[in-house]
UniProtKB/Swiss-Prot annotation:
Keyword Plastid applies: yes
Cellular compartment(s): Plastid, Chloroplast
Protein's UniProt name: Pentatricopeptide repeat-containing protein At1g71460, chloroplastic
Source organism phylogeny: Eukaryota, Viridiplantae, Streptophyta, Embryophyta, Tracheophyta
Pfam families hit by this protein: PPR, PPR_2, PPR_3
Disulfide pattern: none
GO MF annotation, one: mRNA binding
Family: Belongs to the PPR family. PCMP-A subfamily.
PPR repeat residues: 75-109, 110-144, 145-175, 176-212, 213-247, 248-282, 283-309, 315-350, 351-381, 382-416, 417-451, 452-482, 483-517, 518-552, 553-583, 584-618, 619-649, 655-689
Signal peptide, first to last residue: none
């Protein structure tokens, strides 16, 4: 099978060498076998014209303007109204044609009409049309109008031209707070890299004695949130209190968002608790912030409180936030209630992100049938819903179906976008399908998806899992704008190829760079410390985790316990376990494994019994750890009992590893008949799945 046809992505080369396949195309041959003429015609020498130059035609109105110019009247006020209608419809081409007509006739245009046109330019992100409107404002002598000047600043920044916005702003003789706010807002919208520009503009604003309002500070808080500038955020918080602006719910919402994005959950909660009259925007910011900081259960509790106590029902923004949270914690029952609310409201059913969120929820909860039902029940499927389905297949281990979905998606007429490609690449990694992975890489290059940090990160992981370590290094070296995920992926690449010390070196280089490790990076490096038995480095990481307040994240606390256990420091492992405020299956499994690593098998079994007696629900990983300990210690009766407990009490489907651990132990202990019976069960269950 050819590479091109394997995924259904057409016109793709078979290897990573895209330059040849995209730029070099052989010319067609004619019937006699002679090469066809080159598509690029040779330049001909242009002879000087001897004929006299033609006189330009006189200007005629019908040549410049279409005959069907949609004017209802020659009255200027009615024409202005028509332009505003076209602006609201984002039909800038027709609106600007009418403006040209008015200019030719010498009919002036008012500021309200220009304001509507500039707003349309912002909605369409059309810098070209915005500059044309700016020219007409100058022609009409309205450039000194402060209202329009503020609108122009906002238009230029929203369309990505901060330089032009600054130029318009500097030309103003008496800039008021509104034009300053427009400049601040536009600089914030233009991205994280403009944080210093926002800070310098804000400082200049204060030095000139401009009266700050809540919108000024809100824009500054948004900039600090994007750059995680906590120190500056705290100073601005104090300034807001000093200026008596902190009673605004709008400003407090921005502050909550900033503290969450800086990782300060406690400060965000304190600000939230101070708000007396909370609207849906504040609740949404709080739920999104908790979800962003991996506090899924807290986000879920707040979501319940919002509905049951405050009687505030979720909008599409909160639904888009809470659906992934429900999937992460496997809250299928509550997820179905939310789905019922979505169906009842009828406003959110066909919204792309809500629809894909429902698919993602069911798939994460292991209910693929319901996920597929939601997907195929929609009349307006798109690339977003297809990507959600692919992600669901991958999450449930159906990697072949996930890879085939990219073909089915194209058969329905949808082209894979950046998110789709980033979803499919991990599937190629799991299947070790380097051929399809290279094809997707070529597709990304051809469609100009690269350089995209998330996509490059996925490519790095795919190549490393496929056993090609030189490609991830090359991709990482060429990446100009690295982020924390790219550094973490590079660490994973070395770990995947069993070069653990190189992974630690990459981590050290990351610390020397401007990027600071997040909870995921810390978890990865803790695993490396466990495998290397590097207790000293593990303790240093533990200190860094405490400083950053990552220890409350379940998987991080579990990795700390496991690291101490594998390094033989059981005392620190127990201390770390006791320090976890809200324990779960991850932390209990980690302490069980810590006892097992130190050959304290009976203590590990007692720990498992204690976990069950306290009402905690063991998962498949917990049973893997317990059965492995029983196998090492030769506890055959306990292993058989735990295996039955897994099946009958917790309704967990045993994996091949669970079966093999118990079967091997039974054979070792001479209980051959029971082992054979279990082997038959194993084969029948594998046939059913």
């Amino acid at each position: 099978m050819e590479v091109v046809s394997s995924l259904g992505i057409r016109d793709l080369p078979a290897s990573l060498s895209v330059t040849t396949s995209l730029n070099h195309r052989p010319h067609r041959s004619d019937k006699d076998g002679a090469p066809a003429k080159s598509p690029i015609r040779p330049s001909r020498t242009r002879r000087p014209s001897t004929s006299p130059a033609k006189k330009p035609k006189p200007f005629r109105e019908r040549d410049a303007f279409p005959s069907s110019l949609p004017l209802h009247s020659k009255n200027p006020y009615i024409i202005h109204r028509d332009i505003q209608i076209f602006a609201r419809q984002n039909n800038l081409e027709v609106a600007l044609t009418i403006l040209d007509y008015l200019e030719q006739r010498g009919i002036p245009v008012n500021a309200t009409t220009f304001s509507a046109l500039l707003e349309a330019c912002v909605r369409r992100k059309s810098l070209l049309h915005g500059k044309q409107v700016h020219v007409h404002i100058r022609i009409n002598g309205l450039e000194s109008n402060e209202f329009l000047r503020t609108k122009l600043v906002h238009m230029y920044t929203a369309c990505g031209s901060v330089k032009d916005a600054q130029k318009v702003f500097d030309e103003s003789t008496s800039s008021n707070v509104y034009s300053w706010n427009a400049l601040l807002r536009g600089t914030v919208i233009s991205g994280k890299k403009r944080y210093q520009d926002v800070l310098s503009t804000f400082t200049e604003m204060r030095e000139l004695g401009v009266d700050l309002n809540v919108y000024s500070l809100s824009n500054v808080f948004k900039s600090f949130a994007g750059a995680s500038a906590l120190r500056q955020g705290l100073k601005t918080h104090a300034l807001a209190i000093k200026n008596g602006l902190f009673n605004s719910v709008f400003l407090k919402t921005s502050l909550v968002d900033m503290y969450f994005k800086c990782g300060k959950v406690g400060l965000a909660r304190r600000v939230f608790d101070e708000i007396v009259e909370r609207d849906i925007v504040v609740w949404g910011a709080m739920i999104a912030g908790l979800a962003h900081n991996k506090r899924q259960w807290e986000a879920l509790g707040l979501f319940r409180t919002m509905i049951s106590e405050e009687k505030i029902y979720p909008n599409s923004v909160i639904l888009t936030t809470i659906l992934p949270v429900l999937g992460d914690v496997k809250a299928l029952k509550l997820g179905k209630e939310v789905h019922a609310h979505v169906l009842k409201s009828k406003n959110y059913v066909e919204q792309p992100f809500v629809h894909s969120g429902l698919i993602d929820l069911y798939c994460k909860c292991g209910d693929m049938a319901s996920g597929r039902r939601v997907f195929y029940g929609s009349k307006q499927r798109n690339a977003i819903s297809w990507t959600a389905l692919m992600s669901g297949y991958a999450a449930n281990g159906r990697f072949d179906q996930a890879l085939r979905s990219i073909v089915w998606m194209q058969q329905e007429g949808f082209r894979p976008d950046v998110v789709t490609i980033a979803t499919v690449l991990p599937v190629c990694a799991e299947l070790r399908a380097i051929k399809q992975g290279k094809e997707i890489h070529c597709y990304a290059l051809k469609n100009l998806f690269l350089p995209n940090v998330s996509l490059v990160t996925s490519l790095m992981v795919m190549y490393s899992k496929c056993g090609v370590p030189e490609y991830p290094i090359r991709l990482f070296d060429r990446l100009e704008q690295r982020n924390v995920k790219a550094w973490t992926a590079m660490i994973d690449c070395y770990v995947e190829n069993c070069d653990l010390r190189a992974g630690i070196e990459v981590f050290r280089l990351m610390l020397l760079s401007k990027h600071r490790p997040d909870s995921v990076t810390m978890g990865r490096v803790l695993t490396v410390c466990s495998d290397l038995k590097a207790l000293k480095l593990g303790k240093e990481l533990h200190g860094h985790i405490l400083k950053k307040e990552f220890e409350s994240i379940p998987f991080v606390s579990a990795r700390i316990i496991k690291m101490y256990g594998k390094c033989g420091d059981l005392r620190s492992a127990n201390f770390s376990f006791d320090a976890v405020a809200v324990k779960g299956s991850l932390t209990w499994t980690a302490i069980i494994e810590a006892y097992g690593c130190n050959e304290l098998f009976r203590d590990a079994i007692n720990c498992f019994e204690q976990m069950v007696s306290r009402g905690f629900t063991p998962n498949t990983f917990t049973f893997t750890a317990v059965l492995s300990i029983c196998s090492q210690a030769g506890f055959v009766d306990e292993a058989y009992r735990f295996f039955n407990l897994m099946l009958r009490m917790y309704n967990l489907q045993p994996s091949e590893e669970h079966y093999s651990l118990v079967i091997e132990l039974l054979n070792r202990c001479g209980r051959v008949e029971e082992a054979q019976r279990l082997a038959v069960m194993s084969s029948s269950s594998s046939l059913q799945t």
